[in-house]
Amino acid sequence: MIKIPRGTQDILPEDSKKWRYIENQLDELMTFYNYKEIRTPIFESTDLFARGVGDSTDVVQKEMYTFKDKGDRSITLRPEGTAAVVRSYIEHKMQGNPNQPIKLYYNGPMFRYERKQKGRYRQFNQFGVEAIGAENPSVDAEVLAMVMHIYQSFGLKHLKLVINSVGDMASRKEYNEALVKHFEPVIHEFCSDCQSRLHTNPMRILDCKVDRDKEAIKTAPRITDFLNEESKAYYEQVKAYLDDLGIPYIEDPNLVRGLDYYTHTAFELMMDNPNYDGAITTLCGGGRYNGLLELLDGPSETGIGFALSIERLLLALEEEGIELDIEENLDLFIVTMGDQADRYAVKLLNHLRHNGIKADKDYLQRKIKGQMKQADRLGAKFTIVIGDQELENNKIDVKNMTTGESETIELDALVEYFKK
């Protein structure tokens, strides 16, 4: 038997309705913030991610699904969404649009060759937003407010917003030099990844999952001590907006995101639920990127965005015992007796469905008792029984499956009955 590839999942009907509910709610929330949907290809040129995500990142070095197409071009299944959206922004010359900033959102599958663990898959669904074309602290604050709004709209309460500033390029350069000087004497004690990053991207050492508890990390210089006046002022304005909005946050000077393109504001949303031993799970992350467009041969525009995993959102809802308010039950199940009634039911179903009524019938020639059980399993709100007598008299009993009460109406009036 051929089985599903490792690190992937089948989303079966019982779960797909949850996905559809979440995606529909996210679509609606985006209209409140004036964000428009963008759809980019599932695969892109490998060079896009090598340049846009960063050669020194784990994503590029270890996790990408890359192959040669029949034209001998290097192609990669997208591991994240920002680089592709920025590529589209540049390619379609959106910088010429007077409605700056351009507010975009995306939703779709991403691919990373990761070790399978709870909430992580090699094909995962990512929802994200990008606001491109305005370097303004109020845009950063709006994006952070949106993050909180999204998770709170699903009823999640144990949320912890963690923020930091990674400064502008000048601040980062000075900070990186200080990190190299700090870690160089002890780098031999660190993992091979950290050793390779020392002179390429030393900030990523702070993000190492293997060596996070080493004393050298705890005593490492802090980026906040290397921010120039412009970066400090920008960060203070972002925090002031968050204070005005009443959004609580925690500052973590060691917070650096795993991708190379972040500048200024960086953030993560954590789930901190004491009901499961205080475990903290990263639900969402993002930040500002002020050099990414130029890195991809675009204009000197700036942007900010975030991405979240639908799988992790579902896991968080499960952890907090939150049931989604999903209404997908049938309006009506038709029970038939005899061939003539069954033929009529096919025609009636077509009429009902074209009038916006969710309806179904038996297809296995079950007895009446079996058909009623099927109606109950499907969660039908109402049932009707059609036989020769009902067809002859043009009258049916509509049974409410919740109360057990029935009402006799004319068969021709069934649509009107459900629309009243």
UniProtKB/Swiss-Prot annotation:
Identification of the protein by name: Histidine--tRNA ligase
Pfam families named among the record's database cross-references: HGTP_anticodon (PF03129), tRNA-synt_His (PF13393)
Family statement: Belongs to the class-II aminoacyl-tRNA synthetase family.
Binding partners and assembly: Homodimer.
Alphabetical list of PANTHER family matching this protein: HISTIDINE--TRNA LIGASE, MITOCHONDRIAL-RELATED, HISTIDYL-TRNA SYNTHETASE
Gene responsible for this protein: hisS
EC number: 6.1.1.21
A GO BP entry: histidyl-tRNA aminoacylation
EC primary class: ligase
Lineage, highest ranks first: Bacteria, Bacillati, Bacillota, Bacilli, Bacillales
